[in-house]
Amino acid sequence: MHDPVEYFQNNLVPMVVEQTSRGERAYDIFSRLLKERIVFVNGPVHSGMSHLIVAQLLHLEAENPSKEISMYINSPGGEVTAGMSIYDTMQYIKPKVSTLVCGMAASMGSVIAVGGEKGMRLALPNAEFLVHQPSGGARGTASDILISARSIEATRERLYQLYVKHTGQDYETVQRALDRDTWMTPEVALEWGHVDEIVTTRGADDAE
């Protein structure tokens, strides 16, 4: 069965036509917005999606390593390794990456959102946030299951440290929040240090 998000992006993406000195040029809407240094993290986080996001970030860095990148996030989360590849690339590249949550930043979507540049992590008024510990299924021998459990515990510890670093919360607070599903409104996310500002309209500087 097809992923409805991928189907939409592949088959129902609007086209934008621009007039240039060489005539008309057509772009799909996401390519046109990429020209404006806007990247979308939309839908479940998986390896297919993450490598496209990483490629866009690297392209924009090569194009201009000193100019900000804007990332719009609406994601229910997904694969830890795929999400961490996006997060790590955001930290690795030279341009500052601002994040704006429009819809949902859950699970690995939350990790990507909190990894934006400090002071440039935004949320719209009706955004939702979810933080929790990683989950995984293990099968096989008792030894295999034990190895898998240790790996998940190590991943959980990395996530604890990541949230401590980016939110300013202490380790125990983060540990309690991630112990179970913790949903946050934008106001709670702001208080928690997950975002830096709740925005309702675009600023004058952003509109230019």
Curated annotation (Swiss-Prot):
Residue spans crossing the bilayer: none
GO MF, one annotated term: serine-type endopeptidase activity
Localization per record: Cytoplasm
Keyword tags: Cytoplasm, Hydrolase, Protease, Serine protease
SUPFAM superfamilies: ClpP/crotonase
Entry annotated with the keyword Protease: yes
InterPro entries: ClpP, ClpP/crotonase-like_dom_sf, ClpP/TepA, ClpP_His_AS
PROSITE patterns to which the protein is assigned, alphabetical: CLP_PROTEASE_HIS
EC numbers on record: 3.4.21.92
Any Pfam family: CLP_protease
GO-annotated cellular components: cytoplasm; endopeptidase Clp complex
GO biological process terms held by the UniProt record: protein quality control for misfolded or incompletely synthesized proteins
Active site, UniProt feature: 107 (nucleophile), 132
Catalytic activity of the protein: Hydrolysis of proteins to small peptides in the presence of ATP and magnesium. alpha-casein is the usual test substrate. In the absence of ATP, only oligopeptides shorter than five residues are hydrolyzed (such as succinyl-Leu-Tyr-|-NHMec, and Leu-Tyr-Leu-|-Tyr-Trp, in which cleavage of the -Tyr-|-Leu- and -Tyr-|-Trp bonds also occurs)
Quaternary state and interactors: Fourteen ClpP subunits assemble into 2 heptameric rings which stack back to back to give a disk-like structure with a central cavity, resembling the structure of eukaryotic proteasomes.
Its biological purpose: Cleaves peptides in various proteins in a process that requires ATP hydrolysis. Has a chymotrypsin-like activity. Plays a major role in the degradation of misfolded proteins.
NCBIfam families according to UniProt: PRK00277.1 (NF001368), PRK12553.1 (NF009205)
Family: Belongs to the peptidase S14 family.
The protein, known as: ATP-dependent Clp protease proteolytic subunit
Gene name per UniProt: clpP
